[in-house]
């Protein structure tokens, strides 16, 4: 009687359209229930039985039910699943496999089986890549996944590296391939093998891509020649090796080892500017005035060089600071170091006065044993030798930016536009509350940005600087010349690391076209998109491996009285994030550890402060003493507690 009844169908349709619905993202909790977060202000409770249909992070549409003034969400439609491809740990029970995703908020095992063509016999503890195949909101009875790749066994000491690389879908090994002979590029190479070029790197560096030679001119000016390794002399554009480098975009530097962009035969040997080996190079000669200005007589040319010394940062720094036992091999090398230090001094002063200089932050180096165990983590401050190389490279990149802009019209540029114009008024208002008066329009210009940065650098603490960071735009890779506000420069194009950056290889080819007086074709936008994406993935991989190693390193300090100095780097509603000064580890301090009475505590991300009973007790950039309360290995998170 009711079958195909149009009135009944209409009533159903009406009920459906009148039932309130909301779209949002599922947030799971450790208690079994969850929330549908619609926006920053509004969320709906999802009861435990309904949570079985969804996963943390799923974007869904849900029906909203109201009972006794309480609203709850019933998941109805999947908009976008949180999990598609993921990594996890396999569990095996009675020949039935399941996989637990490697994610802090995903605890449930998902039934799975190996995909066709994967011949590994999976067992308990194995790490694998999986892809979701079924979801309850797609009409399936349950969640289900397929194992598409075996990563490694559970007892492999190098799990942090292999799992992280698989998670971000990055290569594990150096590319294959070899270059047998140099290309005929129609370039005349200047023979500079007699000059005393030197390289300055870490003791363990094999891929040396820059060598320096300095000369004092009679008029008190200094001449600097920067010679850069020349992989494009071996790798033809569009060749198999070139395409591999284009995809990888960068050498991936992880704690303990790197995965090069080019085959090791090239990166660590044929192209590496090894001491006493004759190598092709692309070179730039510039004149530096007494005040550090780079004069207009910039010259780029192809060359052949022979490095006369592989110098090490710490040894050179010690020698310049009159400490340690190391001595340069001969007077010629000593003279080079002295002249390079003078150039560094001049360029540093010029950048301080006319551009911007980054604050020195130490690099943290993991010292690992043969089984990947963390023996120590050392802070390596940026010393004079590091600054010598940095100033030479920045000067060379400024030269390339000018030459490419004037002779070619494009290149691979690092562009940073400073503050987002949409944030200018809010920025000016915030600065005003702290006694700094800026014009909202002026601060959007390079000059205005530099002026503000110098004022911020003169502040007694970095607190205000940390507050305005959220108003800044991101640096971009662009084919169009543009300013780099972060460096305080009108244009910046890197070409000094072609062994490890594909963008620098592109700039080499464009600079060679300029040397020969030829025209060149503009790099495609897809190339800059790929480079930006790879840079993001490599940084995430470095962070993920680091988090894992920090957790391993600090595990035995959990629950002890060992104190660590820690800088507050972020404050949120739930607590504070701090960075341990001695080793760089990031830890979280939950709000209850700051003050027991929740109503008396205000943690404000907006203001970067923690207030207790209305009084500011902590703020971002403060350095406090903490102990390690807990290390959770499964999520690689470190929980700290302030020392009372």
Curated annotation (Swiss-Prot):
Subcellular location field: Cytoplasm
Location of the RNB domain: 189-516
Enzyme Commission no: 3.1.13.1
Reaction(s) the record says it catalyses: Exonucleolytic cleavage in the 3'- to 5'-direction to yield nucleoside 5'-phosphates
Pfam families hit by this protein: OB_RNB, RNB, S1
Gene Ontology molecular function: any one: RNA binding
Biological process annotations from GO: mRNA catabolic process
InterPro entries per record: CSD, NA-bd_OB-fold, RNase_B_OB_dom, RNase_II, RNase_II/R, RNase_II/R_CS, RNase_II/RNase_R, RNR_Ribonuclease
GO cellular component, as recorded: cytosol
Residue ranges of domain S1 motif in the record: 561-643
Family as reported in the entry's similarity comment: Belongs to the RNR ribonuclease family. RNase II subfamily.
Functional description taken from the UniProt entry: Involved in mRNA degradation. Hydrolyzes single-stranded polyribonucleotides processively in the 3' to 5' direction.
Protein name as annotated: Exoribonuclease 2
């Amino acid at each position: 009687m009711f079958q195909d009844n149009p009135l009944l169908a209409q009533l159903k349709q009406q009920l459906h359209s009148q039932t309130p619905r909301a779209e949002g993202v599922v947030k799971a909790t450790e208690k079994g229930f969850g929330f549908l977060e619609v926006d920053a202000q509004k969320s709906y409770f999802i009861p435990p039985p309904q949570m079985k249909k969804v996963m943390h992070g799923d974007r869904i549409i849900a029906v909203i039910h109201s009972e006794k003034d309480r609203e709850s969400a019933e998941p109805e439609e999947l908009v976008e699943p949180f999990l598609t491809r993921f990594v996890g740990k396999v569990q095996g029970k009675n020949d039935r496999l399941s996989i637990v995703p490697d994610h802090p908020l995903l605890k449930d095992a998902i039934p799975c089986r190996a995909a066709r063509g994967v011949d590994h016999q999976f067992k308990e503890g194995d790490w694998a890549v999986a892809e979701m195949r079924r979801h309850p909101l797609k009409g399936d009875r349950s969640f289900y996944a397929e194992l598409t790749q075996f990563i490694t066994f559970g007892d492999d000491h190098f799990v942090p590296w292999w799992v992280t690389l698989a998670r971000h879908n990055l290569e594990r090994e150096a590319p294959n391939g070899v270059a047998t002979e140099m290309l005929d590029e129609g370039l005349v190479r200047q023979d500079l093998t007699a000059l005393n070029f030197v390289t300055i790197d870490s003791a363990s560096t094999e891929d040396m891509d820059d060598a320096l030679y300095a000369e004092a001119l009679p008029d008190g000016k200094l001449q600097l020649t920067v010679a850069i390794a020349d992989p494009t002399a071996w790798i033809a554009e569009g060749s198999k090796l070139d395409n591999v480098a284009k995809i990888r975009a960068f050498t991936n530097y992880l704690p303990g080892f790197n995965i090069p962009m080019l085959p090791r035969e090239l990166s660590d040997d044929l192209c590496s500017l090894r001491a006493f080996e004759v190598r092709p190079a692309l070179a730039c000669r510039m004149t530096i005035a007494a005040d550090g200005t780079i004069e207009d007589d910039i010259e780029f040319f192809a060359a052949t060089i022979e490095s006369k010394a592989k110098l090490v940062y710490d040894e050179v720094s010690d020698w310049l600071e009159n400490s340690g036992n190391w001595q340069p091999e001969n007077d010629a090398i000593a003279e080079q170091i002295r002249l390079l230090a003078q150039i560094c001094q001049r360029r540093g002063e010029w950048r301080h006065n006319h551009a911007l200089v980054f604050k020195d932050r130490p690099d943290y180096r993991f010292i690992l044993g043969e089984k990947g165990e963390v023996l120590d983590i050392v802070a390596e401050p940026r010393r004079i030798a590091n600054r010598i190389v940095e100033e030479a490279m920045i000067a060379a990149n400024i030269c390339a930016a000018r030459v490419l802009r004037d002779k070619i019209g494009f290149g691979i540029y690092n562009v940073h536009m400073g503050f987002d114009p949409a944030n200018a008024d809010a920025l000016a208002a915030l600065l005003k509350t702290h006694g700094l008066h800026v014009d909202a329009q002026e601060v959007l210009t390079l000059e205005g940005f530099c002026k503000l940065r110098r004022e911020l650098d003169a502040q007694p603490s970095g607190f205000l600087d940390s507050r305005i960071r959220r108003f800044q735009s991101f640096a971009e890779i662009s084919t169009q010349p543009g300013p780099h506000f972060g460096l305080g420069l009108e244009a910046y194009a890197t070409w000094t690391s072609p062994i490890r950056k594909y963008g620098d290889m592109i700039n080499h080819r464009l600079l060679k076209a300029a040397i020969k007086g030829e025209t060149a074709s503009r790099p495609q936008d897809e190339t800059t998109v790929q480079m930006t994406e790879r840079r993001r993935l490599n940084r995430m991989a470095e962070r993920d491996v680091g988090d894992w190693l920090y957790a391993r390193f600090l595990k035995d300090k959990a629950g002890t009285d060992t104190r660590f100095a820690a800088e507050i780097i972020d404050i949120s509603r739930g607590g504070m994030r701090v960075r341990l000064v001695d080793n760089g580890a990031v830890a979280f301090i939950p709000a209850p550890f700051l003050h027991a009475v929740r109503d008396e505590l205000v943690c404000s991300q907006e203001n970067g402060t923690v207030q207790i009973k209305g009084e500011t007790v902590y703020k971002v950039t403060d350095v406090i003493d903490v102990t390690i309360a807990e290390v959770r290995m499964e999520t690689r998170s470190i929980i700290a507690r302030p020392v009372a």
